């Protein structure tokens, strides 16, 4: 997260409630990855960690971006499975029991794919165009409108640990190495509070990383 002072406490409370009410048979921990926030996000995270031992936080020394942070965050997890999501409520916590059900049924990956979105229409159009270009450029079949929100079994996280990729592109890695996966569609709600820090340049940066990933042979990254 980056400058999410209006959301971190609320998303933590929503996650705790979800586990208490729907997944009480599971143990869990909540790990926040902060990308050098300049508002009160870090202050609140430290307070939350002191208040609840199930809440953890990783404080990056600088903003490593929305590609690198989730990847390296997954590498720090130790559970039988891990779920990555944003803290602005655009990734609904209500999806988590659905992920767990698919995982219990034997799926290694469970991916949430946007069937529609209440985000800016221009950005949604650009994302759609990006996936069309992705498909033309690569022999790897992309998972359209998948942002990383989903469940990852420990066996797949171990695959990530074996990769030697300084600039990992999670969506490409999943398309290339993912197996036995399930897709669940959802309508992406609007951000609950605060403002997005993603802009056209962010999307351009992601597209550049994905192009680099696609043009490198697999054995040069492993």
Per-region residue spans from a language model:
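Structured catalytic core of nucleotide-sugar glycosyltransferases
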Residues: 1-120
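Acceptor/aglycone-binding surface of glycosyltransferases and processive sugar-polymer synthases
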Residues: 60-62, 66-76, 81, 93-168, ...
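Catalytic donor-sugar/metal-binding loop of nucleotide-sugar-dependent glycosyltransferases
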Residues: 166, 172-189
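Conserved small/polar residues in nucleotide/adenosyl-binding loops
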Residues: 212-218
């Amino acid at each position: 997260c980056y400058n999410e002072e209006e959301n971190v406490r609320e998303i933590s409370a929503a996650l705790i409630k979800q586990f208490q009410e729907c997944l009480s048979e599971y143990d869990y921990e909540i790990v926040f990855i902060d990308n050098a926030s300049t508002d009160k996000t870090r202050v609140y995270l430290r307070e939350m960690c002191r208040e609840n031992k199930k809440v953890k936080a990783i404080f990056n020394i600088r903003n490593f971006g929305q590609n690198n942070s989730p990847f390296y965050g997954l590498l720090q997890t130790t559970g039988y499975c891990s779920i990555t999501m944003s803290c602005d409520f655009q990734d609904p916590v209500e999806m988590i029991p659905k992920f767990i059900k698919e995982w219990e049924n034997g799926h290694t990956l469970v991916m949430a794919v946007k069937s529609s979105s209440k985000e800016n229409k221009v950005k949604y159009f650009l994302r759609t165009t990006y996936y069309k270009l992705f498909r033309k450029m690569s022999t790897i079949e992309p998972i359209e409108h998948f942002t990383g929100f989903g469940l990852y079994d420990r066996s797949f996280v171990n695959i990530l640990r074996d990769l030697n990729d300084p600039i990992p592109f999670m969506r490409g890695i999943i398309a290339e190495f993912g197996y036995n996966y399930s897709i669940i569609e959802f309508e992406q709600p609007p951000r609950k509070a605060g403002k997005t820090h993603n802009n056209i340049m962010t999307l351009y940066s992601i597209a550049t990383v994905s192009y680099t990933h696609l043009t490198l042979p697999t054995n040069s990254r492993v």
